[in-house]
């Protein structure tokens, strides 16, 4: 066991772990390329009908040690599809660094730095094409009250820009607070409130603005949610969910639902 080794280098290596996942799914036209490709990494663009690629690598230092731990995530997704109206391509590349520090038994500090690039290309719908870069910093402070109750305070600053088309840009600030209350397995309550300030430059009625602002509006936005879960019996659960949002230019939107879940 390197963790209990007398050598410092072995102890250091025991704190490091890594997870890697790769998947590739593709469909080709045998009329164009009748040869069966035994190499899954070889891609013939001319005969390609559909393509889905995913790669994820997560590097941990001091995994599951809340006193201090570091997580670096690299994620890459790519896809291509041919439809009757033309072909589409999209990709998503994420580089994320997550630092977690347990200050004491009551407070946990988490800081996330994110670098993301999203691209979309449509053959016949030019207004859906974008090349978006997103840089963000996201500190979060968690206060624990008891074994199952906690409250989160968070702030997120994002700078987002589109390098093609109308070259839209967005500076978004998000202040949020969330509350989690749980009484063992009998009932649970989750509440969240968020304030967004979107400083957006570009056409607010475009597909690009919807993607960059996640469906929110230019200026000030407010979102809130409440979820209550209760266990009626060993085989029956009921959930009450309420969602709301408001902005300067759109009337308040309310959305609620009730879910009844039976376990057999």
Feature map (PLM): residue ranges:
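Exposed, low-structure sequence patches enriched in small/polar residues
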Residues: 1-264
